[in-house]
Every structure is written in C-alpha cells, then in structure tokens.
Amino acid sequence: MFGRNKIRSKQDHVILLVDDDKGQLDVFATWMAAVRPDVHVRAAATVEEAINLINAHTFSLIISDYSIPHAGAGLNIFEAAVQSGIPKSNFIMLSGTTDNLPDEVRLVSKGDLVALETAIQQALV
C-alpha cells in the first residue's frame, strides 16, 4: 500500500527504458553501461510491461519512446509514472516529433545522445 511494497534495487539509481524496438533497447543498455555504470537499467517492450514494472518497482528515472507501438502511447506510461509518484522531471520522452505532447513532458529527440545524457544527469542529481 502507498508504494511501500515496491522493490528497490541495490544500485543508487534504477532507470526504466521503454521501447518496442529491441535493437533500441539493446543499444541504450550498452550506451548507458558506458556512460553511467552506477545505474541499473530495466527494460520494457510494451506499455503493459512498463506499467506493471512501474507498479512493482521504484525508479529514479523513466525514459520512454513516444510511439510504442502507436503515436501517443508513451503518454500512458507517463501518466502511470506520475501516479506512482515519480516527479514529472524524472520522465523523459524520446520522439522524432513534438506533436501533441503536453508541456510538462521532457522531450529528447530520438538519437540525440548528447541531449539525452544531459537530461539524465539533470534528473539524477
């Protein structure tokens, strides 16, 4: 009740990455291990899987594709994250488009690793 039963990793920071493209998940996990070896990365390939993980675990940061599998589905993950208590600033949406995104969603263009690394560092301070 009230998140007390959520599982916390032994690492200081746990990041959830959500993308329906397995190749993107693999590339991100490899990149993250090189850039931030102090974090533990969990991955989800569907909206349902992501929401189940959000309900069962505590995450420091959630990074989600906007179009998983269709445009806007990432907003369902954003809503679940906010309901779980994660600050809106600790949610990053990856997208090639900015259409229909609420102002409170932090957007990083897919493939812009410099901007993504900056956003991750700001969220994990």
Task: Please name every model-derived segment.
Residues 22, 45-49, 114:
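Acidic phosphotransfer microenvironment of two-component signaling modules
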Residues 14, 40, 58-60, 90:
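Structural signature of beta-strand start/N-cap positions in the alpha/beta core
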Residues 22-42:
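Two-component/phosphorelay signaling modules centered on CheY-like receiver
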Residues 29, 43-61, 69:
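Acidic, metal-coordinating helix/loop segments flanking the phosphotransfer/catalytic sites
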Residues 18-20:
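Conserved acidic carboxylate
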Residues 78-100, 108-109:
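A short, hydrophobic beta-strand element within the central beta-sheet of small alpha/beta folds
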Residues 63-82:
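Conserved phosphotransfer microenvironments
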Residues 1-16, 99-125:
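Non-catalytic signal-transmission and effector/linker regions of two-component phosphorelay proteins
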